[in-house]
Amino acid sequence: MSRKSVIQRNLKRISICSRLKSKRDELKAIIKDQSISMNDRFLAQVKLSKLPRDSSYIRIRNRCLVTGRPRGCYRKFKVSRIVLRQLGSIGQIPGLTKSSW
């Protein structure tokens, strides 16, 4: 299981990202718009760079909700492959069946 501080850091990044998403999108739209003057686009670039680094969605890591494992995490179920197998074998995930042929 991951350290609690790492899990909390990721949750903090998720909250910051969701809070500042609209502001980042507005600034990015200004930066990409060719009809706006170069000076205004540069000022938007400066404002974007002054936003917290953790407000970018790239810094969010998909982690297992149960164990906090960063790798092998299924997005659909939000759990790792190990937990998915355990929960699936005892019937805790609806619609998930063991395959046989």
Swiss-Prot record:
Entry superkingdom: Bacteria
Pfam families in the cross-refs: Ribosomal_S14 (PF00253)
Molecular functions (GO terms): rRNA binding; structural constituent of ribosome
Role noted for this protein: Binds 16S rRNA, required for the assembly of 30S particles and may also be responsible for determining the conformation of the 16S rRNA at the A site.
Record-stated family: Belongs to the universal ribosomal protein uS14 family.
Summary of subunit composition and partner proteins: Part of the 30S ribosomal subunit. Contacts proteins S3 and S10.
The name this protein goes by in its record: Small ribosomal subunit protein uS14
The encoding gene: rpsN
